[in-house]
Swiss-Prot record:
Subcellular location: Secreted; Cell surface; Fimbrium
Region (Disordered): 58-105
Source species, domain of life: Archaea
Domain text: Contains an amino terminal motif QXSXEXXXL, which is part of a class III signal sequence.
Biased composition (Acidic residues): 70-105
Motif (QXSXEXXXL): 9-17
Main location: secreted
Native organism: Methanococcus maripaludis (strain DSM 14266 / JCM 13030 / NBRC 101832 / S2 / LL)
Name of the featured protein: Probable minor pilin MMP0601
Listed Pfam families: Class_IIIsignal
Disruption outcome: Disruption of the gene does not change the piliation compared with the parent cells.
InterPro entries reported in the protein's UniProt record: Class3_signal_pept_motif
PTM info: The N-terminus is probably cleaved by the prepilin peptidase EppA, which recognizes the class III signal sequence.
Amino acid sequence: MLLNSKRGQVSIEMLILILAVLLSGTIFAAHMTKNTVSHDEISDVKKQTFKSFLGSVEGSTASSLPEKISEEDTSPEEDTIPEEDTSPEEDTIPEEDTIPEEDTSTEIPIGKNVKIYNLPIKEEKQNWFLDILNTALDRISAILDGFFSLFGLDLFNNDEIIPNILVKDFEGNRIPLSFDWERLSYTTDWFYAKEIEFTGDSSAKYSKLDLFRIFPIYSYSDTTFRITDLSYNLTYDVPPSTAKKTITITSNIPEGIKCKVTYKIGGILTGDYYTLEIDEKTSSNKYNNVNIAFE
């Protein structure tokens, strides 16, 4: 009996011990699992915070770098652009503005290379001629007047015709100038012109030709090319009110060409030529030239 009771007690104690061991194992296992889970969570949190920190650091550095680059790029552009743009503008603008302002002469400038001259007609009973005086170019022509004009002939030697000459009559109509022009009588082929306009420029080409010549005996020392007789007799062909008006000469022909206005008093054979007084200063040789030079 005693033996049986002892065996039963030992079995009960062994059972209790086994249960205690199992219980402690489960408790230990449960505790270990709790520690591992918390450790994993902590590591995940650390990883996420580290990644976010790295992202913030990269974002801050990326945002700061383009600002520095843009500042370094724009600073030299802002320095070079106004220097290159403003320097030529400041040099060219005053030069273009001061050129027309300096023209303070008696002539009336209507353009950069164009001037207008008003030639007053003071008297009525006179013959008015407009001549181009050769100064710098080669010999333009030689005109014979006086005795040979009685036969209705003039001499033209080595004529160099100047193109782009517009002659207008008193009604504003254009009068064409013929290159093979010859005067067959004293009263024909002369134009009653009110305005003579030169439209050539500095690079104008001159057509040179020899016209029909008769009696090549005499020529003036001052070679001229007579464009037009403004009036053979103003009192006969032009009303006195019109004859008293001014003659406008607009010119932009090359430098070296000048003009003069002469009138004749007397008959065909004995008449003398005089220069129209454009201003008070007249030269001793009776040539009061009006400069219509290209500038």
